[in-house]
Structure formats: structure tokens, C-alpha cells
């Protein structure tokens, strides 16, 4: 099968990008020298499973969150466990509403977030089995940790009670905490999961280039071992540090598929 090599880059802000180099069949495909930049699809449009889910989540959080933002896990005390997945999602939505209201009262910017509800399976729910629903979130909010924790509650005034525990940590992008947290959030493959994100989040910028590499050049790099060297790819992407390399052979298209991740200092232009 005749193929050309396409490079697709997803850039998230100034400090992170993912690059795929892949064989594309020539027949029936419009080939351009360099495609114009466009934005990646929203979370709703992504197939939220496995590799696709993890990759887009990493792209999105790196485009919108950074040092000083919060990584949250919210759990339930036994007496407040939701009876259904839908109830758990409503409680998380109520928590976000309380965050917005608290920020507005304090004259602070509205919070930016990506949150997800996890727990149980449809089969377990139908059987009436216990489900340990919980929530994960990426959060940019000017409230302090104590104020955020106190909003994970039910009731008002003297009847106000905490729903469960709130685990908070500060994001450290240079240490890979955003990527690690994304992996942790989608670690369980068989539980139910629902995503929400705040309006106005920046989308990763996608760039397509069909002329940067030839099939022969990629095959030579794999054969000589250069394709597995971070320094080889860093020369092609000045100013970026290659943090992961994955090379696979596509039997159907008879070509190599290269997947790269790059990082650089956030204050780099």
C-alpha cells in the first residue's frame, strides 16, 4: 500500500504538546503541504475510552491548568452515599454551583474546571449493589483549600454537614502531576464515568504537516535506533524536551507509527 507520512501536532498552551507521525494511504486522501491550525474536538465529541480519552484529557488540562491549580478527589461518608450514578452527578453539580456562588460573593473570578464522576457499573446498579461513587476534578479557583473543602457539604446553617472527605493537592506541571492525575482519573476501565467542563476552556491547537517526513526517513530512523532517542526528536522541535517516545509498526499500512510527548518551561515564548 502506497502511503505518505503525516505529522499531527496538538499544542496545549506554551508548555506541552503531543506529536503523532503516521502512515496515510495515498488513495482517496487529499494531501497538503501544511494544514492550517484548528482546534481539537470537545470532550463530548471524543470517544471517552482508553487511549483517546487519556490523550485528550492530558491535552486539555495542559492547555488550561498549571502550577497553583487544584487537583481534587471528593468522596462520600457511608451515610451520604448516592443511591444512583445520576444522584452523584447532581451532587457534584451542586458543589460546582456553590463554588461559583462563593467566588462571586468574594469578588473573585469564576472557577474553571474539568470534573468527572466515577463508580459502579450499570449491571451493579441494576442489581442494587453498593457503589462507591466519587469525583475527581482539575480546578482553577481563587478560594483557599479550607473554603473549598467546606463547600463539599449538605444542608444549611446549623444543619450543614460534610458529605465526606476532600483530598486536595497543588498541580506541579514540571513534575508531571497533570499527566499523572489524568491517568489516575481514568484508571478504571469498567466503571461508569461522566465528564463535565466549564465554559470557555482553551482547546488544544492542532497542526497537520504532510511534508516534514518521508516514509523512508522514518524507516531509517527506526532501523538505526535514532527514532528511540529523545535527542533525535528534540533537534526537529527546537526548544522542546522529548519526554516520551512510542514506536509501533502498522501491519495493515506497512509503516511505522510514532507517538511523541514534549514539554518545556512554561515561561518559554
Regions found by a protein language model. Give the residues of each.
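Right-hand nucleic-acid polymerase module
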Residues: 1-131, 141-269
Amino acid at each position: 500500500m502506497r502511503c505518505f507520512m503525516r505529522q499531527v501536532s496538538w499544542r496545549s498552551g506554551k508548555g506541552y504538546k503531543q506529536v503523532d507521525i503516521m502512515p496515510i494511504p495515498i488513495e482517496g486522501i487529499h494531501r497538503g503541504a501544511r494544514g492550517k491550525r484548528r482546534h481539537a474536538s470537545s470532550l463530548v465529541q471524543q470517544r471517552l475510552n482508553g487511549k483517546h480519552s487519556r490523550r485528550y484529557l492530558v491535552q486539555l488540562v495542559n492547555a488550561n491548568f498549571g502550577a497553583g491549580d487544584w487537583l481534587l478527589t471528593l468522596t462520600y461518608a457511608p451515610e451520604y452515599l448516592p443511591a444512583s450514578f445520576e444522584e452523584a452527578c447532581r451532587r457534584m453539580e451542586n458543589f460546582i454551583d456553590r463554588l461559583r456562588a462563593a467566588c462571586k460573593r468574594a469578588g473573585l473570578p469564576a472557577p474553571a474546571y474539568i470534573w468527572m464522576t466515577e463508580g459502579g457499573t450499570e449491571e451493579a446498579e441494576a442489581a442494587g449493589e453498593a457503589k462507591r461513587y466519587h469525583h475527581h476534578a482539575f480546578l482553577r479557583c481563587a478560594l483557599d483549600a479550607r473554603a473549598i473543602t467546606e463547600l463539599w457539604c449538605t444542608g444549611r446553617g446549623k444543619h450543614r454537614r460534610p458529605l465526606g472527605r476532600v483530598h486536595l493537592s497543588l498541580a506541579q506541571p514540571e513534575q508531571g502531576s497533570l499527566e499523572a492525575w489524568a491517568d489516575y482519573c481514568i484508571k478504571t476501565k469498567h466503571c461508569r464515568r461522566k465528564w463535565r467542563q466549564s465554559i470557555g476552556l482553551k482547546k488544544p491547537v492542532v497542526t497537520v504537516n504532510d511534508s516534514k517526513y518521508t516514509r523512508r526517513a522514518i524507516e531509517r530512523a527506526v532501523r538505526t535506533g535514532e527514532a528511540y532517542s529523545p535527542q533525535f526528536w528534540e533537534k526537529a522541535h527546537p526548544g522542546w524536551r522529548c519526554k516520551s517516545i512510542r514506536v509501533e509498526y502498522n501491519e495493515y499500512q506497512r509503516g511505522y507509527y510514532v507517538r511523541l510527548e514534549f514539554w518545556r518551561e512554561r515561561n518559554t515564548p
